[in-house]
Amino acid sequence: SARTTAPSVFPLAASCVDTSGSMMTLGCLVKGYFPEPVTVKWNSGALTSGVHTFPAVLQSGLYSLTSMVTVPSSQKATCNVAHPASSTKVDKTVEPIRTPZPBPCTCPKCPPPENLGGPSVFIFPPKPKDTLMISLTPRVTCVVVDVSQDEPEVQFTWFVDNKPVGNAETKPRVEQYNTTFRVESVLPIQHQDWLRGKEFKCKVYNKALPAPIEKTISKTKGAPRMPDVYTLPPSRDELSKSKVSVTCLIINFFPADIHVEWASNRVPVSEKEYKNTPPIEDADGSYFLYSKLTVDKSAWDQGTVYTCSVMHEALHNHVTQKAISRSPG
């Protein structure tokens, strides 16, 4: 099981500036961190136009991602990388690689990085809450990025256990900052199909691809294990502050798909008030996570009852709740 690992940050600079001298692409490679997430800002958040941060890729138990920004060719930019799990903050300034004046850059116009490999396809699972509540609709999503303006037409075919299905919705393509398109197809699925481990396949056709790309996803294989849920009061050391933390510890569950939310005196709490860690693999292959609810100390002192609700497929009726409040005295 992977330990918390801080990322390394490397600048990515084009080796030549386009001779019109207008725009160029700079980037930062954030490599070898665990767990998710990291945040990447440019110029401390002042630079938002022309930014494209790609999804993280998991390799050998560690995540990596790339963030790119398009700026005027005379400009440098600083990427600000934060990895909360390891309390790491790294600022890396990226500037174009200058060639000596007597020998100006004579390489052909730098191809934009998105065109090197053509379109890429990613498939995403349904949200755990959607698969566990009959009143909600679980959806598998297929996303195609780096679709060129020359070949913008994208077709999707969906399969459930290799049988074609026709109820997907393809959304209108969206133009990205770098003049490529992003296209998304969403397949509503049956709760039981996901929970029983059926395979969902998205097949993508585009003339810029030498052959269709297929991506498959299914629930993690293995025997489900029921989570144990414990609520923890604020630490005595924290009670001198105006805000205190009520914690929900959820352990011993498998697979990692889980949903946690809170209520205060039976009223649902806004998601802004609590933070969940990602599920973390434990030594025995099960998962655990913490959920931290921040509350006013005055509300805690008044005996407000806080309830941690956990949804997981191994639970009876897919849900369990644990309540906590200040003990009298």
From Swiss-Prot:
The alphabetical list of record keywords is: Disulfide bond, Glycoprotein, Immunoglobulin domain, Secreted
Signal sequence extent: none
* GO CC field: extracellular region
Please, what other remarks does the record include?
A: This chain was isolated from pooled serum of strain 13 inbred guinea pigs.
From the Swiss-Prot or TrEMBL record, state where the protein is found.
Secreted
Disulphide bond pairs: 28-79, 142-202, 248-308
Tree of life domain: Eukaryota
The record's section on SMART domains has: IGc1
| Glycosylation sites (chain numbering) | 178
Put simply, this protein is called: Ig gamma-2 chain C region
List the CDD domains. IgC1_CH1_IgEG, IgC1_CH3_IgAGD_CH4_IgAEM
Please name the InterPro entries in this protein's record: Ig-like_dom, Ig-like_dom_sf, Ig-like_fold, Ig/MHC_CS, Ig_C1-set, Immune_Resp_Modulators
